[in-house]
Amino acid sequence: YEATFGWDASPISTARLCAELYAQIKDEDWSLTSPTAQVSYWPQRLWRMEKPYQFIGDGGGMGIGYAASASVGAALANRKHGRLTVAIQPDGDLLMTIGVLWTAAHHKIPILSVMHNNRGYHQEVMHVQRMADRHMRGIDRAHIGTTLRDPFIDYAKIAQGMGIMGIGPITDPKELAPALKKGIALVKGGEPVLVDVVTQGR
């Protein structure tokens, strides 16, 4: 029930992102390889995780480029099993280790990276808001140095420049399922794919 709040909103809710992704992968032999705190733990709340390799995401290194690198490493390990590797990739995290996209392309590591593109270092946004409130300074300037806007980043184009199929940016919730389906088909064919989804903060 809670997952349906803002279901048709744009930017896309993190609950819808996770629900739509699970609908596409649930009948596959899948492995989620990214942390889930950034998406309010929706995968744990909505997905059936029954095998130990289905969630190998949280390593405690959030916000320092952990997710992208760990996910590509896990995808390399999963490749020999023919397992569909999926990462819900935070945008600020990816920017710290952007070269990992080239690594995935160069070594032909099949992975579906679904961008949680909330256009900011959202973990820091919330921290700055808490600190500003604590010191009674207001939060109207919390975006300075913590958001990624003016211009917005097109991660699909960055992926293409690194040799990976880039899909998006997806801003309309109705376009999400077809984009994920296309991406999964390509990954199952052995390609790394990035689907850029413009999302709400959490």
Where are these regions (language model features)?
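Thiamine diphosphate
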Residues: 42-201
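Active-site diphosphate/adenylate-binding microenvironment
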Residues: 1-77
